[in-house]
Amino acid sequence: MRYDKAEFKSAYGTFSQLPESDLPEIAFAGRSNVGKSSLLNKLFMRKSLARVSSVPGKTVTINFYDVDGVNFVDLPGYGYAKVAKTEKQRWAEMMEGYFNSNRNIKLVVQLVDMRHPPTKDDIMMMEFLQQTGYEFIVVMTKSDKLKKKKEYTERLENSKKEMSFVQPDRIIPFSAENGEGLETVKKFIEQYVGG
């Protein structure tokens, strides 16, 4: 798969704007500011194709990228407390609409900040994916921020316990800084879209 040929296609502010498509899709989900854009940029081998922000709640649209005939779908981040109720409602409608509309979703890449235990929202999202039968992996972002080996190992082991319903080989530590886990993420993506 030619990740370096990735192109931004379009952004949609409501579910009803989404065009129908039978192209295979890889969806990226996670809390606001968890590092979805950083992971996408690392995959695309670009600095800023996906906009990175230090402001939580920045991605409020569903963003589509074309990668070799596969849609990479950057879903809006959830769980940011300062977002107005109307925005939370719009987010819920977009997510529900996206996942319940018979799209050709091959894999969901669920991102969780490795420095902290998964939140209630993270667990709810993963349970939803499991109950609805979507294939998913969990990418533990910001692994490079855990400087001490002991802290890193403990956090990873605790995460595996906290997400015991996820197969351990599907929990992948990732760093946008040093590239840890990137090749493993690519292998899973390629496994589900056929290379």
Report each predicted region and the residues it spans:
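Conserved C-terminal guanine-recognition region of P-loop GTPase G domains, centered on the G4
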Residues: 96-169
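Conserved G1/Walker A P-loop phosphate-binding module
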Residues: 1-80, 194
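Canonical P-loop GTPase G-domain recognition
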Residues: 3-15, 145-195
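Amphipathic alpha-helical transducer elements in NTP-driven molecular machines
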Residues: 88-92, 119-123, 153, 179-182
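Structured catalytic cores of enzymes that bind and process phosphorylated ligands/cofactors
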Residues: 26, 33-34, 40, 63, ...
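Conserved nucleotide-binding/hydrolysis micro-motifs of P-loop NTPases
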Residues: 58, 70, 77-80, 115-117, ...
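Conserved nucleotide-sensing/catalytic segment adjacent to the nucleotide-binding pocket
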Residues: 67-105
